[in-house]
């Protein structure tokens, strides 16, 4: 699902809100989440999951085009850990 599809679906389900209001709310929520992670804080949405930063240590990588070794610096990357309720709902899906 894309952000546009999410906005469309929520606007349809919440008839009292316009698509522009839903879009504004989604954009603000995502901006606040990004700002929170950027400051190094953790985000927890009970039942859904938590977002945090994990540190990736420096390592030697490889340039796929040339095959030569490249030294990669350590960095923080976003990490999502699903909550119990979300895991149970996904586990119940029969693919």
Swiss-Prot record:
HAMAP family: IHF_beta (MF_00381). This is Integration host factor subunit beta. Belongs to the bacterial histone-like protein family. GO terms for biological process: DNA recombination; regulation of DNA-templated transcription; regulation of translation. Pfam families: Bac_DNA_binding (PF00216). GO terms for molecular function: DNA binding; structural constituent of chromatin. GO terms for cellular component: chromosome; cytosol. Keywords: DNA recombination, DNA-binding, Transcription, Transcription regulation, Translation regulation. The keyword Membrane does not apply. PROSITE patterns: HISTONE_LIKE. InterPro entries: Hist_DNA-bd (IPR000119), Histone-like_DNA-bd_CS (IPR020816), IHF-like_DNA-bd_dom_sf (IPR010992), IHF_beta (IPR005685). Heterodimer of an alpha and a beta chain. This protein is one of the two subunits of integration host factor, a specific DNA-binding protein that functions in genetic recombination as well as in transcriptional and translational control. It comes from the Bacteria. The keyword Transcription applies. The gene is ihfB.
């Amino acid at each position: 699902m894309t952000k546009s599809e999410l906005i469309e679906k929520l606007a349809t389900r919440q008839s009292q809100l316009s698509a522009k209001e839903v879009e504004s709310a989604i954009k603000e929520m995502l901006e606040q989440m990004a700002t929170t992670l950027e400051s190094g804080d953790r985000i927890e949405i009970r039942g859904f999951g938590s977002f945090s930063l994990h540190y990736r240590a420096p390592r030697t990588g490889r340039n796929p085009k040339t095959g030569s070794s490249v030294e990669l610096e350590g960095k923080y990357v976003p990490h999502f850990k699903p909550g119990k309720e979300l895991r149970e709902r996904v586990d119940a899906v029969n693919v």
